[in-house]
Amino acid sequence: MQTSVTAGTVFQDTRKPLRLWFRAMWYVTNQKHGVSALGLKSTLGLGSYRTAWTWLHKLRYAMVRPGRDRLAGIVEVDEAYLGGEKPGKRGRGAAGKALVVVAAQEDGHRIGRIRLRRVSDASAQNLGRAVQDGVDPGTVVRTDGWSGYGQLEALGYVHQVVRQDSHIGENLLPMVNRVVSLLKRWLLGTHQGAVRISHLDYYLDEFTFRFNRRKSKSRGKLFYRLVQQAMAVDPMMGKDIKGAKAKHRTQDIVYT
């Protein structure tokens, strides 16, 4: 029985040579702000936009390391709406909008690592799961006074509620706010804001991968990490990409 070297990896069943995949990963990790499917198609000489689009989503999928460490220490947590023309109502979904929970770890006076997770609404159940997924129990978690965070103490966190006062003004959670601003700028600049909500999770994974490695001076190390993780994640077929067969609908587009 013969087993391909790509079996059980993100490259499984590929018809393209691995060296072309490696070129794609080198190109992706060497572009500071990311790449578009059109840019990848042009750079590699791929036959179709669809192939480039599928490859990029597979690589974004590989950017999440299995069993990755959760945040610890002091972490700010808040939610942000992406897209749509009208402001969303907290605790509820909104047509044409995606609600993302943002967790930012403090590193002195700077932002350390982050975690991003899309949720359907800002209910206590969804917010609790998002925090548990990305933050170690015992961590100091700072939030605003939204009731959806009221169960964090019971979940094993040291919950600190930051309230507006004359000293800090309205910027209650500055690190989270900075991350949200950079995320929106990245979606608008690199992807022209045209990211379907059904595909947003992959873009959040890429932004997290890039942000958490933004201080690395070695592009080669980023390339190595991506290759390493591409070999560690489960296979992903094009048909498995969330929303791959979804029809384009106006409310599925994230405008930031």
Predicted regions and their residues:
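Residue-level recognition of single "structural anchor" positions
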Residues: 1-256
